[in-house]
């Protein structure tokens, strides 16, 4: 379960009912990346985000009930609330700490104590876990695209460090998300994720584990 939390903490939200994969998802590097899943490798075609957050289409703004499913049936369905709001520049961004805490508590319950944003960097969050553990997650690569007015794709690579008793454990997690607006109050999505070894073992790496998820978002406000 902790590994699933590592995958989910970097997300603004999880995934939904599938539609056709492949180049039809949109032109460019993200479509090519999707075509190659699950045989992903690093380095990925993801520019460094600096200190800018991932910006979403305006139709994401608000609070949403999420129903997240594992199409393989390995993990139980998750139900939680996420929210997106305007930042100081007027762009719609995910409330990362709120959303990560919602996902984490749905997975781990009381084992997740708190999630905090780094006030100096919107791409860095710190989660406090039971057992004197702390998970630090920093987005180090990102690319997004809108093939049309109702579709949005985003790919993020996060560096994750789990601090606790013993030596820190370092890994990299990549999440490619594809969202489609079904109407003003519904969004469906699909996500593809892969985890990689620590950069200390080499910047180039093949995916060690892969996962795909589906989700449906229904507007609350």
Each model region followed by its residue ranges:
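Residue-level marker of positions within ordered structural domains that often coincide
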Residues: 1, 69, 184
